[in-house]
Amino acid sequence: MSENGLKEQITGKVEKTKGQVKEGIGEVTEDRKLKNEGKWDKTKGTIKEKVGKVKQKISDGLDNKE
């Protein structure tokens, strides 16, 4: 199992959650900039999470070949 992939998935989830919070606060306070920052953080988090999953699958596949 790839620790690096798992670490990246966790980092992605944290960043995605942070983005959701920022977006929500931006929505409530009508702060367009904060809302957009939140959307961007969510997107970055989703990408990191997916990259981590791919890394983990590749690592698991390589481990199974040995």
Swiss-Prot record:
Upper lineage: Bacteria, Bacillati, Bacillota, Bacilli, Bacillales
Region (Disordered) residue spans: 1-22
Pfam families in the record: CsbD
Family in the record: Belongs to the UPF0337 (CsbD) family.
Compositionally biased intervals (Basic and acidic residues): 13-22
Highest taxon of source: Bacteria
SUPFAM superfamilies tied to this protein: Hypothetical protein YjbJ (SSF69047)
InterPro entries noted in UniProt: CsbD, UPF0337_stress_rsp, YjbJ_sf
Annotated organism of origin: Bacillus thuringiensis subsp. konkukian (strain 97-27)
Protein name per its UniProtKB record: UPF0337 protein BT9727_0908
